[in-house]
Amino acid sequence: MFRRLGQDFQLRKVKKILKQINALKGKMSSLSDQELVAKTVEFRQRLSEGESLDDILVEAFAVVREADKRILGMFPYDVQVMGAIVMHYGNVAEMNTGEGKTLTATMPVYLNAFSGEGVMVVTPNEYLSKRDAEEMGQVYRFLGLTIGVPFTEDPKKEMKAEEKKLIYASDIIYTTNSNLGFDYLNDNLASNEEGKFLRPFNYVIIDEIDDILLDSAQTPLIIAGSPRVQSNYYAIIDTLVTTLVEGEDYIFKEEKEEVWLTTKGAKSAENFLGIDNLYKEEHASFARHLVYAIRAHKLFTKDKDYIIRGNEMVLVDKGTGRLMEMTKLQGGLHQAIEAKEHVKLSPETRAMASITYQSLFKMFNKISGMTGTGKVAEKEFIETYNMSVVRIPTNRPRQRIDYPDNLYITLPEKVYASLEYIKQYHAKGNPLLVFVGSVEMSQLYSSLLFREGIAHNVLNANNAAREAQIISESGQMGAVTVATSMAGRGTDIKLGKGVAELGGLIVIGTERMESQRIDLQIRGRSGRQGDPGMSKFFVSLEDDVIKKFGPSWVHKKYKDYQVQDMTQPEVLKGRKYRKLVEKAQHASDSAGRSARRQTLEYAESMNIQRDIVYKERNRLIDGSRDLEDVVVDIIERYTEEVAADHYASRELLFHFIVTNISFHVKEVPDYIDVTDKTAVRSFMKQVIDKELSEKKELLNQHDLYEQFLRLSLLKAIDDNWVEQVDYLQQLSMAIGGQSASQKNPIVEYYQEAYAGFEAMKEQIHADMVRNLLMGLVEVTPKGEIVTHFP
């Protein structure tokens, strides 16, 4: 409805619908509870008679608005209704912090639940999902809808498939992005219909949609499978990397996060390792480890990208500052960072299944979402998801004052100036929320505040468990909170008594972040619902975003500069410096968009392959195919292919048969002419028919033959798909590390990925036959099948 329309025109269309909804206020308030609830049945009936969701939007929104008032004591404001309209039409509603996004969602959720195909509300964490489901669930249940939350009370307890099936059959499901992703992957690993629990994806509302679809877009969800043989190269390669010289032995493009070896670097590596050619096939593992080790040293910084906890390395989410406890970098990069830090190496595992959030949410018929910072990324939302971003007016005029940045040459000057600013406002009693870019900087500010005798809280990846409590206290008079960018999205900061009179909450940013959206989120922590407040950023030429994306003269300026008097830090003024910061952040945002676009391009090949594999699995599971017919087709094709191979002797044919078709063949009869493919095929089919007949006779007594066929075929698909997923991840890493080559990496990746997929299909058919014929089966006294596949 709003695709590519201007903001004013979008709002005019929304306000036209709002006017119709407001006209029904009196009518809805006059209905009894029973009459209001009966509207749900009426709406479903109208849909079944041919009306569309759009046809009943006005009346449905008026109904749930009235229900919100009766059950929750909150009547959605006009601006909340406007946000709800935007989301129903599959777009992003940009609503400021404190504008009531949770209540806004009740309207499109209620309306879209009538389809009977399910509505999902996705939040960034389990706490928010449970909280919102409990609060808003009162409204939905009052109106006759069912609601499900796919979490157990005990995190260690695994929910059974039948339990999840009931939950996902609800009209409305509240979940998290990661939980939904892993449920999708696990659903497609089921070996029978009873193990599946998801229905097709219909409509989703994503809370903090930019965080999930943009900031987390490049982190794939992975279900780890069998461990690899652990490489012992990590330590020696890490030592090698410390001897290499940047610019001579390898090239590092920081803004693109690319590294590659030079000819000199390859020679240095060969001398160190005592090999003749690093790029020979037998030395490919050395080359791969070397690229990972350089990336580990140049692209990953301790206490910013990861922390060390005891003898363990844990990744940190750049966008939120939260620990990514269950996430491991793939392909050996994780172990390369561990080797760099000299901590225990975690086991290398193959990925059984993998998907990105981009790919996951594109499966929904309709996506919508809400955030406080979507407009600056509207172009990317349109290009990637075909969603417009509509900025919803605030219910009350914003009173927060956003002051211009203070820019300094060096980091120490900036830290000193920001500390003086903190002391100034702390003395007045204002609560202060100080945002930093890393765990390391949070520790620095904490030690400085401690030295000044200022009591404070620290919120970083090391103590995220206290996030809600710390954030809830940060609006009280005199409170000082030092936080990484994680601080409490989804949790309002309410001002304590007397704080508004002092000017409200003061937000201080101690550096510009890599994305303008994160800076806007930081500012947005202050000034909720018309509260007073202010924000200000302190920036230096040594900050990461400027070092990484600023012009070359910047580096020389802060290197040559000598601080004369730390207590009199020099503020850089003028358009040149103001533009410098803006351009650096713009370049950073652009690099982020490019990286996400590249991730999407790489993922497209995986998506196509995954879709084919999962559809084939489902056809074997759901009973839509006669499995005996499938087996006949597979064996016909297989015997035709393998019989066409040239067998130079009876011994070679015998060896092939006993390793691929049957253990029970003692010899190849003399009358078989091994050079006659028709005779060879006929003999193979005799052996195959005998093997299958014996299994069928045994298993049919217990009605288990079809189950055996299904398990044999699925095992072949799953084993090979695990190898293919792992191969595609290795391939993307390898091609991504060859940036110096003249080839288009995406084209090269697609070609190699397609060739790998074709080879996988051939191997699947061969393994299906081996499983069917050489799998050992037995039936337990309880009538259950036990299989041992080759």
Curated annotation (Swiss-Prot):
Its EC number is 7.4.2.8. ATP binds at residues 80, 98-102, 492. The keyword Translocase applies. Its main location: membrane. It holds the Pfam family SecA_PP_bind. InterPro entries: Helicase_ATP-bd, Helicase_C-like, P-loop_NTPase, SecA, SecA2, SecA_DEAD, SecA_motor_DEAD, SecA_preprotein_X-link_dom. Disruption phenotype: A single gene deletion has about 60% decreased biofilm formation, 75% decreased adherence to human lung pneumocytes. Has higher pneumolysin (ply) i.e. hemolytic activity in the cytoplasm but less in the cell wall. Decreased levels of a number of cell wall and secreted proteins. Deletion of 15 genes (from psrP, SP_1772 to SP_1756, includes the accessory Sec export proteins SecA2 and SecY2) and infection of female BALB/cJ mice, shows the psrP-secY2A2 region is required for lung infection and for infection to progress to blood. Mice infected intraperitoneally showed wild-type infection. GO terms for biological process: intracellular protein transmembrane transport; protein import; protein targeting; protein transport by the Sec complex. GO terms for molecular function: ATP binding; protein-exporting ATPase activity. Keywords: ATP-binding, Cell membrane, Cytoplasm, Membrane, Nucleotide-binding, Protein transport, Translocase, Translocation, Transport. It is found in: Cell membrane; Cytoplasm. Part of the Sec protein translocase complex. Interacts with the SecYEG preprotein conducting channel. Has a central role in coupling the hydrolysis of ATP to the transfer of proteins into and across the cell membrane, serving as an ATP-driven molecular motor driving the stepwise translocation of polypeptide chains across the membrane. Plays a role in export of a number of proteins from the cell including glycosylated PsrP and pneumolysin (ply). PANTHER family: CHLOROPLAST PROTEIN-TRANSPORTING ATPASE (PTHR30612:SF0), SECA INNER MEMBRANE COMPONENT OF SEC PROTEIN SECRETION SYSTEM (PTHR30612). This is Protein translocase subunit SecA 2. It comes from Streptococcus pneumoniae serotype 4 (strain ATCC BAA-334 / TIGR4).
